[in-house]
Every structure is written in C-alpha cells, then in structure tokens.
Amino acid sequence: MIIVKSPREIELMKKAGEVVAKVFDECSKLMKPGVSTYEINAKAEEVITSCGCTGPCKGYYDYPAMTCVSVNDTLIHGIPSHKIVLREGDLVSLDVVANYHGYCADATRTFKIGITGERANRILEVCQKAFWNGVSLIKPGIHLGDVQEAIQKTVESNGYNVAREFTGHGIGKGMHEDPSIPNYGKAGNGPILTKGMALAIEPMILEGRKDVRILGDGWTVKSRDGKLTCHYENTVVVIDDGYEVITLTEEEKKLYV
C-alpha cells in the first residue's frame, strides 16, 4: 500500500533531506585520493548525529554503517572500510539515509576523484540525466511507469544498462516503503501518482552487461564483468503541479530548481 504523506510529515522529511544534503557537502571535501571509504562514512555519521538525526541503514539486517560507499565497479551497498582507499580517477557513490523525528530522506551522489577519464565522466552524466528525465514528468495523475520508461530509455539509448535486481522505492516513516520503482518499465503502467506521495528515485546503471554479483559479505553488489557503474538518487515528493526534490544541496538547487 502506498502511503500518502500529510503536509506535516513532508515537512519532517524535508528536515531529513536537509541533513542528507549537508552530508554531501561535508563529505565532498573528503573525496580525494588517499582517503578511505571508512573515513567518508565516519564524517557522514558525525553530520547525521550532530544534526539530531539517526541513520537507519546502521543495523538494518546487521548492516554495519550509516552509509554505503561504493567505488567503480561496485554498484551499491559498498561497506565502508579502512582497506578501500580512493585513487585518482575513481568514481565513488555515497548513499545516505537520515531519519528526523521518525521520517526519512534518502539520496545518493556519485563523486569524481581527481581527474577522471571520459568513461567515468560519461556514465555519470547519463546517470544524472536519466534521473532528471524521469523525475521531470512527475505530477499528479501520471503513471509511475511513465517515469520508469523515461529512465530506461535514457540509459539504454546511451549504450548503458539498468540494474534489474534493485529498485527505487517509496519512503516516509520507513526507509523502504511501497511502491517498488524499477528503473525500467512501460508508460501508462503502474500506480497513478497523487499529491503527497514520496518516492526515492534512483537510477543504478552499468557500463557493461546488466548482470551483477553479490560478494560473500552479503551486501556489496558489483558488476559481474568488472566494468564501471553509477548511482544517482533523490527523495522526490509529488506536489500540486509537479514535484519537489527534497535532498538537493544549495549548489544543486541553483542548477536544478
């Protein structure tokens, strides 16, 4: 069942979204060669807790951290580690969920480490474009499949693949709520959007084959062929005449709002 949020609930989610954005601002300063993914998560946890939030990822099915930090061929759910140290040219995704007074916001950014090559630059550009091409359609009365198809077409027309096993999702009191939102679909299908729905839209794309593998830790998801991956996500609320993205940094708002 899709839970429609009240104005008060959305305000609390926006507070959580502001904290997620602050995490990106602070952690962006650490995105450079020689920094471990453990250090990035430690800074994120410091920001989340200092802002009066909790990080619901930590302890979720025994997951050990508040964030996922995934590098290059790791698509999602990279466990922060002292052993994973950033290098020049890497792509690093930081997936953050903050819970403020019982309500969540969820977003992911992929960062370029130092000078990156054309492959990294292009997959990041396409991943972001896929998100915005899909989200730009959101308004009351459309089908969720309209958004999914736009994301899929953007990704595949540029020569990439969308991950099939993992999806976006509804969000609110729960970190994961209905509906499930695959990054593929057909326009005119799926739930009809209404004002007050809150959705985590998150293209997860692969440079090579769509196949993935999960490591023995039970979490880390990698491209099976070892090629680059990219992940971009925001929490989006359906409003009267369209949508509002509630997890943007102030700099991002200048670009997208």
Pin down the residues of each PLM region.
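Active-site neighborhoods and metal-handling regions in enzymes and metal-associated proteins
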Residues: 1-257
